[in-house]
């Protein structure tokens, strides 16, 4: 455990010195600042106002930006260490493969989760100072969604980094996966299935297997428990499960998916030629 924590600390320290972390923090901190400057909390759209509307807009933007940030900054974790021989150097010490691998994941999780979480905390604190009503249920749900989103894409990134030896190839695969989850499943695949008159329930089930789609739906579930803004899609979701069950599912499913990918990545990592 001591070695694992040491690897996590070293990865965290390295990330904090990297330019990408500064940009990453500024993006999400800047989003919150921009929303306040633009007067988002002072306006009302579709019944959403105050901090509730700000958090809704923040999570909707984060759903798009956070996955690609996690993927492109993490897929080079192992492949990059292999390229510059850091991996070979680290394993020359009495450190096991599992300690190295899970230490890297732990350190990177803290690095990518902390800025998005602290940006939300800053919004809540600023709102409290201004005397705004704090939507605690929405805040806690979004913290859970951010945790699940970080876990799922971190697992995917480490699986890619374990399989691919080249950092450039890893970046290309990461970008393709992001585009695939963001657009292809929603637009191309579903359009083809609708043209072939596939059952609507099957189409929606495939769409909800996409973690990014899960986050989109869960993000509005507290504002709109009946999911009326989604139209007929809401009937399939709410017929299959209650709103509370769906919220729990939207957090547990991506988290377990990320853990599964991380375990698969570890199995690949320990069986491959490390150098």
Regions found by a protein language model. Name each.
Residues 38, 42-45, 183-259, 263-266:
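Terminal transmembrane helical anchor/hairpin motif
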Residues 57-80:
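Long, hydrophobic alpha-helical segments
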Residues 1-25:
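Aromatic- and glycine-rich beta-strand/loop motifs that create alpha-glucan
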Residues 34-39, 44, 48-63, 107-168:
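Secretory targeting signals
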Residues 77-109:
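Helix-loop-helix units of permease transmembrane domains in multi-pass membrane transporters
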Residues 147-181, 185-195:
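A structural motif at transmembrane helix-loop-helix junctions in multipass membrane proteins
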Residues 10, 14, 99-112, 116:
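Start (N-cap) of specific transmembrane helices in multi-pass transporter permeases
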Residues 67-74, 122, 155-156, 185, ...:
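Hydrophobic/aromatic residues in alpha-helical transmembrane segments
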